[in-house]
Amino acid sequence: MKITFRIQYRTVWGESLCVLLSQNHIQHTVEMTTRNGEEWTGKAEFDFHPSEPICYRYAVSRQGTLVRQEFGAIPHSFYPGNLQQQHYLVEDCWRDLPQDAYRYTSAFNNAYTPEQPSRLSDNTGRCITFRELCPGLSSHGQRLGLIGSCAALGSWEYCRPLRMKEVQPNVWHLTLDASSLEYPFEYKFVAIHEETGAVEKWETRPNRIFPLQPLQRGETYLPMETEVFFDDAPQRIAGCAIPVFSLRSEGSCGVGDFGDLKLLADWADETGQKAIQILPINDTTMSGTWTDSYPYNSISIYAFHPMYIDLRQLPALKDKKAAEAFEKARIEVNSLPMMDYEKANKLKMDYLRKVYQMEGKKVLASEDFLHFFRHNEEWLQPYAAFCYLRDSYGTPDFNRWPKYSTYDADEIARLCTPGNKAYTKIAFYYYLQYQLHVQLLAVSTYARAKGILLKGDIPIGISRSSVEAWVEPHYFHLNGQAGAPPDAFSVNGQNWGFPTYNWEVMEKDNYRWWRRRFSKMAEYFTAYRIDHILGFFRIWEIPDHSVHGLLGQFSPSLPLSMDEIRSFGLNLDRDFMTQPFINDKVLEEVFDAQSEYVRQHFITPNGKGGYALLPEFDTQRKVEAYFNGKEDEDSLKLKEGLYSLISNVLFVTDHHDAEKLHPRIAVQNDSVFQQLNWKQQGAFNHLYNHYYYQRHNEFWYQEAMKKLPVLTQSTPMLVCGEDLGMVPECVPWVMRQLQILSLEIQRMPKQMYEDFGHPENYPFLSVCTIGTHDMSTFRGWWEEDPALTERFYHQEMHHQGEIPVHAPGWLCKDIVFHHLKSPSLLCILAWQDWMSINEQLRNPDIEGERINIPAHPRHYWRWRMHLTLEQLLKEKELNQTIRELIEDSNRR
């Protein structure tokens, strides 16, 4: 079989095009030639399997290295047919993403059934194969058809269109006998009823014209793939955001579970919501205490937390007394207003161990489990071994394990061998993950059947005490700490403690680590949120001797030399720039009555009229260690004060090149900045703004474009980015180019110098919400800053008179409707904000509804809904109100 590829693509000197072609996992590269640097031709001759599609992408190379390739989730494709002697003439144009890429994602396609393309008989000599992209038809009981001016195309009779086959999701093919057509002919694509075949919609463009295409016997011509558009209003949907642990049902066990998630899907369906967004559900079990409640610090990027198993779907305990005792304890822990992480997890794990003793061997021998194990063994076995060793040694910190501290695949395989004395305990974790897989997959299938988008959350970081850090340490910089610079959430920045990624190593295998992670998630979810998408451009890297985030620097970055700093008019002594500035005035401002105590115990005169920290207190980690266990008010004040002295510097030294510097983030708020005269302050601010808002834009754009196209197109899920905080100008460039949905929050406007965003102006490719899990609810925010609330009430809501002290239901309803009316593709509101519209049902404890406070690094994540899901499903008035709000905003 021969294939001739033709494409127009303008190259520059030294570049060439090739075709990256595959069938049945067999890869081929076809080099292309050109006479003018614009019209390219490539020829291939292979034996191909007739029933499998040939998929291919175009790529640009320079000196043998690929420098660009098509990155869309939908490659070009065609089916070769039955004749191995056929010659395929393929016309193409370069394509990265379809115009409305979101419509091609699994979030908006729930009804695809693969079809084999139509095939002509073996004695047919000349063929034309149309290949079109058109999303969403199957979900509406339609398929793509072709109708045209000649008799073979129905002579424009609306009841005689030719039916096309959906060979891949949203990809439609039709092969015709070229000799049956009258050239030139006009034609259009139409949406036809699945059963009757009647035309229901015509594409919105002038008639297409097919010119005379002389073909030799044995040739099949494939014109360019095109996108087919119909005059449809964009599908905007509404949804609810809530952590799984926050769900409450009559039968749950002190914490929400996957069975409750199915009930939430029922409520979403009842109210007309088509999206459910949750927080990360990965296993975070480290100490077994409430500190494990933080869902972004998991021990595995694949394994789910055992607390999410719905015990109701498992066998009942055979021991009657044990069953009665469990039920009594379950009712008690489930009646608590907040999650008691320790009680709920201990109760559930005790039950799970008993059930494992009852049915573990049977389940582990089942064909379904063995299938699950074969497909997940790569991560499941190390995870189960990690859990066993964590339990055995009493710590998840593998560096402290007396044995197996360095991962060895062969040793771990021997440890996990059936018959080994540890196997029963290790296999317990296989059993748990299998049950979690079965239950979440059932929820996913259930939600899809109702047309509900299930949106997961991918944390940016991994724990340094995790399976991944143990098994694949080469992918990480374990001596660094990831975090975020100061923002509305935290004036000192955030130090998450996660190691940073070794992107150079990850790039070598085309980011396999990330692609595996996304692929696993796609088994259950149709959309996902990339937590801190800015981390794919650059990450805020904090030295391991720091507690706060103020002494961090972006990585990768372009640090400044001393000559560059001087070029901005800033001629200062390097020690003054990089050493903590401490004098008597600073001490009085920071410590007040404790100043003399600080002079005597923590600092020493530096001979320049100021002070230097003693070596035993010259880093924040040393100070933290000194004050460990001292929780009295004076000690806490001293500790925070010493932290602030240590970060009172104008510049921080680059982690890789000690000769280069970074301006310290937000230093204008600190006393060292006040030591500069007005001219020096102006020069510093000029340098600061250039460094943080201009210098890196192109550099960080290129960094993101190395990673994000590969990752976001590796699965069919809808991609949403959490683009809050200190957002460089290049971030929206990339997100628009890759059609990644942005996050829009009215009280965190993207426009500088504005107090509030304007939902009516949000971009279509965005997720609109009132607040995130890191923020107070709308009712909570309403009471935080009366002056700001007053401006919002008068200027944004256009109300007159005195503002209500507490946000009444009618006002909350207005806010909800205002957000629903936004142009955003998704409007996903926190469950608490949905409930705020009903004064009889909403929680009277406003502050208790907050999920997280980012400024508190040891926050207890424990909020649970105050109503049961069964109650919620019975609240007809509330549910009807929500449905009407959604319908009136033209969401569906």
Predicted segment positions?
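Aromatic-rich carbohydrate-binding modules that target alpha-glucans
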Residues: 2, 8-53, 61-82, 133-183, ...
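Catalytic cores of glycan-processing enzymes that make or break glycosidic bonds
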Residues: 103-129, 177-180, 209-892
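Terminal, intrinsically disordered low-complexity segments enriched in charged/polar
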Residues: 93-99
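C2-type phospholipid-binding modules
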Residues: 80-82, 88-93
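Intrinsically disordered, low-complexity regions enriched in Ser/Pro/Gly/Gln/His and often acidic
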Residues: 32-33, 87, 163-165, 195, ...
